[in-house]
Amino acid sequence: MKLIRILIPLLLLAGTSYVISSCSKEKTNSRLSVYLTDAPGAYDAVNIDIVKVQIKASSDQGDDGWQELPVNAGIYNLLEFKNGMDTLLSSIELPAGRISQLRLILGGNNTIVLNGSTFELPLETPSAQTSGLKFNIHADLVGGAEYKMWIDFDCARSIVVTGNTSYKLKPVIRTFTEALSGAIKGNVQPAAAQATVYAISGTDSLSAIPDAVTGDFLIRGVPAGTWNVVADGNNGYLDQTVSGVAVTLGHVSVVDTITLTP
């Protein structure tokens, strides 16, 4: 029986991906890697309590058929995972075939740090602690192939302000795969501009915060098409737009350095 190796790492802005490579000489195993990533938010830390990750092979929409993966459960600060950084959550071998869904189950120890103060972040949807957050995958895993998947946890949209010093967590998450998306990378200067970078196409928008030292940014999970890249400056620096950036599946589109001026 062919087996599939499933790896579940952790990342910071954008979704889900599949990459094919040899896994053994006999090509009897396949590997699925799942990463957690985060869209930027204006916080010092966003601590998410990850309890379980499960997968489902059947197309049944009921609550049966879920298989729990061996996961390095714990509290992860999403803001530590950006511009390509990640951490492995799980590794498992499974029979080759179709995976229809993935489920992420969160715990109750979620917090944010804002201006040096820590605030509890209760889940607005309690089912995220019981039935979990479900994602449709519909991946046909083949022996000898490697599959990578990203889950994009959007911090800014996931945190709901309910009072002067009270917040709730309402997870806004998307998934993407390398095989079905591209990426945009570049650099924004100067660091003093503290810019946020947006990729915009029609009503769709994705974002990233450049590295505070180098100014480098990477936006993953970008659908194929033509995008405008906007560097939104702060501290008196003017915005700048790079129009017509072409994105193709499985490739990284590189934007020339964007220099903002006061």
Residue ranges of predicted features:
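A short, solvent-exposed, low-complexity linear motif enriched for acidic/polar residues
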Residues: 24-244, 249, 255-262
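C-terminal motif of bacterial Sec signal peptides marking the signal peptidase cleavage site
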Residues: 18-22
